[in-house]
Regions:
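Conserved acidic donor-binding segment of nucleotide-sugar-dependent glycosyltransferases
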Residues: 258-259, 263-275, 281-288
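Aromatic "clamp/platform" in nucleotide-sugar-dependent glycosyltransferases that forms part
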Residues: 226
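A charged, aromatic-enriched C-terminal amphipathic alpha-helix characteristic of glycosyltransferases
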Residues: 285-319
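N-terminal pre-catalytic "stem/leader" segment of glycosyltransferase-like enzymes
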Residues: 1-71, 250-252, 264-265, 304-308
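Extended catalytic core of nucleotide-activated donor transferases of GT-like folds
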Residues: 37, 41-116
Length: 323
């Protein structure tokens, strides 16, 4: 019997491209004749914001039998739970954010000692962290940006866009005592009122394609997320021609270049970021040529995160693992 691959996935129904990638990995593997499944916890759970045609198995289904030659792929946030699922099956940990590795644990861990035989890392800096600090060999399988975020060349130059700045609140930051979002939101609200027709729009809980359309019709996106890997909304905005004004966020070191493909600030330099955002509003016409060049560069950067590149790396990895 052909061995199977199960992607353990949280029962979380809000839009999250991190969860979307779990589904898309399964979709890619199945298109290459790997018997792969999304594995949710509770029967009947589903998400409605993502377009993905994949079979879903459920942990509470007594008919599910994970065999010793099957592979369980576990996101880093579920790594502690993952060692209790699937008996003596093979295990791979899928790390999308190095900051979250230790969240499920009370002390530093070795993934190998926990029973994980290998790791998938979304970006080079994540691979480096895993191999230096968590005792596991990692393979980079890069993320990709959903193709419907990419605008045509005319769109990337900012034509027919609203003078609008998008922000995406992220759960957990305020609770963690990181107040940058509230500071920049209040400052931008005032700056937009003082510089019509500029508007600020906070976006949350919307379908993925609707987010893409908003980005393709907006000039800027502000992100003050600071504990990130891919920080998906930033490269999505780059693809859509919606120029990011953002923190590096740690993970951005792998693809952000200040004044070339984004306006980039060190983490927590919230007032410097606010100064630049206001300047972009006030001197928008004056900066039009510079902004057009940066949008083009941003789109080129985003284009390197293609589904084809993800597919190539993922299929090669599972081929090496014997699937």
């Amino acid at each position: 019997m052909q061995p199977s691959v199960y992607y353990l996935t949280p029962d979380y129904d809000l839009p999250s491209w991190g969860i979307g990638l779990l589904y898309k990995h399964v979709e890619i593997l199945r298109s290459h004749n790997v018997n792969a499944f999304v594995l949710h916890h509770n029967s009947g759970f589903s998400i409605d914001w993502l377009e993905a045609d994949v079979p879903i198995a459920f942990l509470d289904d007594p008919s599910i039998e994970i065999r010793s030659d099957d592979m369980l792929v576990v996101p880093e946030l579920l790594a502690r739970e993952g060692i209790t699922v699937g008996g003596n099956c093979r295990r791979t940990v899928f790390v999308q954010g190095s900051y979250f590795v230790l969240q499920p644990f009370n002390e530093a861990i070795s993934y190998r000692d926990l029973g994980y035989e290998t790791a998938i890392a979304v970006l080079p800096h994540v691979k480096d962290v895993l191999e230096r600090h968590f005792d596991i060999t990692a393979t980079v399988v890069p993320p990709f940006i959903a193709p419907y975020f990419f605008c045509d060349e005319r769109g990337s130059e900012g034509h027919s866009r609203q003078q609008r700045i998008l922000m995406f609140p992220k759960l957990g930051y305020r609770e963690a005592g990181i107040f940058d979002y509230e500071i920049i939101r209040k400052l931008l609200q005032r700056d937009c009122r003082q510089n019509p027709p500029w508007k600020l729009l906070e976006v949350s809980g919307r379908p993925h394609r609707e987010v893409a359309a908003l980005m393709q019709n907006s000039e800027f996106m502000v992100s003050v997320n600071c504990l990130e890997a891919f920080n998906t909304t930033v490269p999505e905005a780059m693809a859509a021609g919606c120029l990011p004004i953002c923190y590096e966020g740690f993970g951005g070191q792998d693809f952000l270049v200040d004044d070339q493909n984004a306006l980039v600030f060190p983490n927590n330099y919230v007032y410097s970021l606010a100064d630049t955002a206001k300047e972009m509003m006030v001197a928008f016409e004056k900066n039009s040529s510079l902004l057009a060049e940066m949008r083009t560069n941003a789109r080129l950067t985003a284009s390197t995160y293609s589904e084809e590149n993800t597919k190539r790396a993922l299929v090669a990895l599972f081929g090496d693992l014997g699937y």
